[in-house]
UniProtKB/Swiss-Prot annotation:
PANTHER family per UniProt: OROTATE PHOSPHORIBOSYLTRANSFERASE, PYRE-LIKE PROTEIN
InterPro entries from the UniProt entry: GfcR-like, PRibTrfase_dom, PRTase-like
Family assignment from sequence similarity: Belongs to the purine/pyrimidine phosphoribosyltransferase family. GfcR subfamily.
Protein name as it appears in the record: Transcriptional regulator GfcR
Swiss-Prot/TrEMBL domain comment: Contains an N-terminal DNA-binding winged helix-turn-helix domain and a C-terminal regulatory domain (or effector binding domain) resembling phosphoribosyltransferase (PRT) domain.
Gene Ontology molecular functions: DNA binding; orotate phosphoribosyltransferase activity
Keywords: DNA-binding, Transcription, Transcription regulation
GO biological process terms on file: pyrimidine nucleobase biosynthetic process; regulation of gene expression; UMP biosynthetic process
Amino acid sequence: MKNIEELILKAVELQSNGLVTGQIANELNVSRETVTWLLTRSKKDVVAPAPKDISVTWNSVGQSSYRLRCISQALCDMVIEKLERTQQDADLVIGIGLSGIPIATMMAEELEIDFAIFHDYDDQKGKTNQRGIFSRNFADVEGKKCIIVDDVVSSGATVTDVAEQLREVGATPIAVAVIVDKMNADMIANVPMSSLVRITRVD
């Protein structure tokens, strides 16, 4: 996306196609707050201050299985480096739907461990105050030592939800791996985070 006007048009288009705020945020790789601002900004008579956020577009990676594999291997290397320091081994890689799934799939293959999927509550057609769920069609997370994978971390809410639910079923989140970290954090939900790109906003 080249500018704010393009983001506004894309947000409005996605909303008209039936996507809810969280889904639009995932698609545009911005926070929910930014999506709300973009949608209200599309109404010309509304003036609100812009939220402090950054749109991330990584479709040049996502459209190529080769590039996805390279990114996944780099994330594996970073996670292994952190796990070796704490002498831990992972049993399972969890991909957060939608964009974390292809990366997590390749990471699980590279690490030769099981794979699971977490569906964020925003995938559940706009239901509010709902928690995400682990898919029953993939590996069981109970009692496992897990690596959580997503494309972009903006506020950390989804990763925190995953980590909390893992702990509730006796699993241990031992690492988080993302392409882009917009929080500029080493830890999220008391779990070490590795990212290929860390964004720091300087005002």
